[in-house]
């Protein structure tokens, strides 16, 4: 039942492929539905070693989204495609049915859409045809009129000039097309590296993650999505999705281009689903992590970004670090912000890790000292 509800949420999320459709009402509805499919009534967790934990995350109340380039698995977020074979498939596709020109028009349309919602494919095509088919004077008049009407920036004007040059090649020969997509492998890497990922999990008591990420000497932070009220934050966090485990499907750039050219809501949703499937699928060996991830994208950023969100609700610390200065700072910050603090400790009598409030642990230590 829960899986079906999640799949319905994912399907609904993908149906809003155009960001312009994400009105405040739509975002609020999506976020409300997300809260119903998240585990633990909207709470997710992040494990961190004390040695590498940045205390300012708690002081400034931000969540770190890491570039996919920094992920601990090079396969993670990589597209399951052979770039050399993809180039050949794309060349063949572009040489058929004037698809190269159609793609140029669509690419420029997508660049202008956010700033010029009234722009149409036909308006761009008419401009390109007029400039390339008529003399220099008429072509320049059309170019200037188009730039003025849609208030193009200097950068957008230059992109239009480059598009005109490619569009005007009557032969549409293989050499021109091959040259224009020759850096596909580099582009694939840039797309991956510009993805910003926040990886979370379903619980605080995963011994394997305490060992792998914290070396049994770290913290686990609890994030409560119910504390998100801001529209812009909701818009970011509606992209929180469940990671799938198994073999990635083969990825085809031609299929994405076809969907973009079709330009229907259904086709765009399918394209988004194909791309996100690559970003959300990991090998079965990672299954125990039960990961949920929030995905964003910042072109050119291969480091990561801070997302300011005051959504911490509890912090779990391993008993071994309680005397560390950084741990004391964390506890003090938790008290100031009314976050719950729990301690993870190993029970020799039960041969199990247990969790209790820091108040109870402190009382127990105090009582033991009195006995001794």
Show the residue positions of the predicted features.
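Partner-binding and oligomerization surfaces adjacent to conserved cores of proteins
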Residues: 1-372
